[in-house]
């Protein structure tokens, strides 16, 4: 569809200087939004170098919106819209790619990003030294990729996904990552790849079908929280002497929950780990 040259129908962006100075710097403020015009799909990319990031559902009449408070000496806003592919890239990029830190005003930066609950959303996020809260409840999530660095990230599915999700991928470095409500995500497959950090994958929610998890853990800890009514099969790449989850029987490198044969919903887990610790907690 041809873009209309009217301010009210296009994305709007503006920047103003923040009034308060922090450690010798003042934060600038920037906002951008694009009205919803019946788009069926939206591919969204979020790039955030450092600070606090909040992501969630927005007003139905807005395809996307972002509000920023940022250190203009070290970072610059990112807002790119590609009408041909209905793709938007939002966030903050470092002015000096080789020197991203968390000192000064970087830790005071804030980004609030919202997406329309009406368009099918293909969401990809990459976070640096950030504290992020991502609530995907109320959105039409078709796929998800979350990549974190030295960060603290919480991803929530506070409401059931409005459509079937093909896959959710999580990649965490030296990070704390908590994903809550994966039962509400309606994702056919979840994959996790972790380095050094603490990770929680919580499968609470309104299950509607079976699902799969591929988990690879180098070091750190992985906690799986699974509803007790779900039948679970865990297959490990090799025998793990330290892995003895309660409520499972083992045959070689395959662990099966006691209710697997009678359960109406199933979680099939493929687990690869070297020095990482894995814990299974049952949710009643």
Kindly give the residue locations of the regions a language model identified.
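N-terminal targeting signals for Sec/Tat export/insertion, comprising classic cleavable signal peptides
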Residues: 30-57
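Right-handed parallel beta-helix
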Residues: 124-163
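Short, surface-exposed interaction patches in beta-rich subdomains
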Residues: 22-37, 59, 64-105, 155-284
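Extracellular/lumenal glycan-associated surfaces
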Residues: 50, 128, 277
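Bacterial N-terminal signal peptides
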Residues: 7-17
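A structural feature that tracks compact, well-ordered secondary-structure segments
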Residues: 45-47, 123-127, 134-135, 214-216, ...
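Pepsin/retropepsin-fold aspartyl endopeptidases
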Residues: 81-87, 94, 112-113, 119-123, ...
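Positively charged n-region of N-terminal signal peptides that target proteins for export
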Residues: 1-5
């Amino acid at each position: 569809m041809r873009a209309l040259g009217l301010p009210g129908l296009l994305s709007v962006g503006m920047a103003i200087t923040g009034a308060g100075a922090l450690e010798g710097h003042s934060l600038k403020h920037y906002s951008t939004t694009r009205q919803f015009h019946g788009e069926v799909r939206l591919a969204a990319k979020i790039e955030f170098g450092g600070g606090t990031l909040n992501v969630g559902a927005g007003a139905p009449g807005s395809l996307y919106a972002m509000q920023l408070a940022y250190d203009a000496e070290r970072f610059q806003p990112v807002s790119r819209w590609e009408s041909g592919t209905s793709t938007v890239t939002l966030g903050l990029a470092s002015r000096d790619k080789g020197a991203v830190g968390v000192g000064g005003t970087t830790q005071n930066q804030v980004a609030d990003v919202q997406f329309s609950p009406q368009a099918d959303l293909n969401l990809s996020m990459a976070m640096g030294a950030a504290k992020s809260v991502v609530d995907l409840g109320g959105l039409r999530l078709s796929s998800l990729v979350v990549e974190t660095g030295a960060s603290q990230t919480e991803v929530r599915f506070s409401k059931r996904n409005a459509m079937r999700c093909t896959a959710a991928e999580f990649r965490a470095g030296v990070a704390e990552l908590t994903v809550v409500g994966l039962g509400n995500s309606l994702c056919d497959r979840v994959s996790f790849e972790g380095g050094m950090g603490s990770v929680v994958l919580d499968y609470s929610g309104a299950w509607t079908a079976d699902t799969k998890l591929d988990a690879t853990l180098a070091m750190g800890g992985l906690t799986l929280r699974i509803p007790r009514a779900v039948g679970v099969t865990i297959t490990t790449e090799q025998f793990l002497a330290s892995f003895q989850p309660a409520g499972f029987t083992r045959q070689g490198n395959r662990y099966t929950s006691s209710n697997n044969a009678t359960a109406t919903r199933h979680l099939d887990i493929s687990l690869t780990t070297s020095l990482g610790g894995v814990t299974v907690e049952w949710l009643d």
